[in-house]
Amino acid sequence: MERLVIEGGTVLPMTGQADVYENGVVLVEAGRIVYAGPRDGAPHLAGARRIDASGRIVMPGIVNTHCHAAMTLLRGYADDMRLMEWLQTKIWPAEARMTADDVYWGTALGAYEMLSGGITTFLDMYFPADAVARAIQDTGIRGIVARGIIGVGGPSEALSRLDESREAFHRWNGKAGGRITFMVGPHAPYTCPPDALQACAELADELGVGIHIHLSETRDEVEEARRNWGKSPIRHVYDLGLMKGRHVVAAHCVHVDDDDIAILAETGTGVCHCPVSNLKLASGRTPVAKMRRKGVAVGFGTDGASSENMLHILGSEMRIGAIQAKELEGDPAVYTAYDAVAMATIEAARVLGMESEIGSLEPGKKADLILIDAERPHLTPNHDVFALIAYSALPGDVVMTIVDGRIVYEDGRLTTMDGREIMARVREAAARLVRE
């Protein structure tokens, strides 16, 4: 791994709102941050490649807490439908036709898109796990693989998916220099009966990993849960023991009450906030500010490209999420630009249980960082750099993305794979998958 000296930019380590270093320096060695701060006091790093960051913002890589990356294959297909109708009549039938090769190329395209917009880490729930892991390896992104597990077809269906998850974990966990890690991924309480959820919990304990699950995404889901179990999906999962003593990452959590929020806070469950997908599917608005006041860690997620249509947090989830949080509480001061940037970086890392490794530019942490070109019309002038990022910056403003100290995206080009081949393969597969 080469040594890097990134100098002359506005450095945002995300260690506090006051920590903004104009004409700052970031030093990278052996894939980790050595220094991030003012030029004065920066140690000398011999034999390093020097990167001029003048006119650019240097900040931690963005963390996507919830994604279905391979669903790039279905971008723009079956839009403008209600969630369950969309899943049951369009998405699930198309997914049933996908091959492992399709998923590899779809995930590779998702990774390419994310890296181009500054996302360096993502938590993915999809299948098959081997194809997802291989795409993470080849594109250079950092990814957590949670093989989606559905148990409505009976115990044998869930067990086969659990076996696949276990085998993929032993093949891939820690590979690609540690960029590939795993969670267990029960899809949701409405697709996983209690015995399947218990089996997922047991596998998570066996492998020593966390759990990723969709919870309380729609009003219909919550109402059905109350009819079936007499309680909310979150209370149901909690009472089954899934959230006790394990790291759980819960996607959506839109329709929650005070009891649900108390459970999330008590158990340290991280919440993935996907505002654009939730708005587009008319699922509702997550009470983000209220959750955070109660001590719940919340990070932005994109969901899949078939519901959000883009796998970008900058200029999309971050901007819409910040505005929505203000509108929901009727108070523009309840949620700040810094809050939004934190929810895309260090707080998102906490959601994933990775805050000791990523999410901020601190000595010893993984060298996952991005450079944003601030010399753009929509980023001029700069009165508040956090406001620029939260409300004005766009994915195309990212000019360099670094993962593990390696430049994986630079000036519009993926450096690890042929981006044109990825797009061509996805176009070919997508045309076949939606042919009815």
From Swiss-Prot:
Which reactions fall under this protein's catalytic activity?
S-adenosyl-L-homocysteine + H2O + H(+) = S-inosyl-L-homocysteine + NH4(+); S-methyl-5'-thioadenosine + H2O + H(+) = S-methyl-5'-thioinosine + NH4(+)
**Cofactor(s) named in the record:** Zn(2+)
Q: Report the EC code(s) recorded for this entry.
A: 3.5.4.28, 3.5.4.31
Name the InterPro entries on file. Answer: Amidohydro-rel, Deaminase_MtaD/DadD, Metal-dep_hydrolase_composite, Metal_Hydrolase, MTA/SAH_deaminase
Binding-site residues for substrate, renumbered to this chain: E95, R147, R161, H187, E217, D303
Any one Pfam family match given in the protein's UniProt record, by short name: Amidohydro_1
Which controlled-vocabulary keywords does the entry list?
Hydrolase, Metal-binding, Zinc
Top EC class for this record: hydrolase
Q: Which CDD domains match?
A: ATZ_TRZ_like
Q: Which residues bind Zn(2+)?
A: H66, H68, H214, D303
For this chain, the family text in UniProt reads: Belongs to the metallo-dependent hydrolases superfamily. MTA/SAH deaminase family.
Q: What does this protein do?
A: Catalyzes the deamination of 5-methylthioadenosine and S-adenosyl-L-homocysteine into 5-methylthioinosine and S-inosyl-L-homocysteine, respectively. Is also able to deaminate adenosine.
Q: Which PANTHER family match?
A: AMIDOHYDROLASE-RELATED DOMAIN-CONTAINING PROTEIN (PTHR43794:SF11), AMINOHYDROLASE SSNA-RELATED (PTHR43794)
Record's protein name: 5-methylthioadenosine/S-adenosylhomocysteine deaminase
The scientific name of the source species is Symbiobacterium thermophilum (strain DSM 24528 / JCM 14929 / IAM 14863 / T)
Source taxonomy lineage? Answer: Bacteria, Bacillati, Bacillota, Clostridia, Eubacteriales
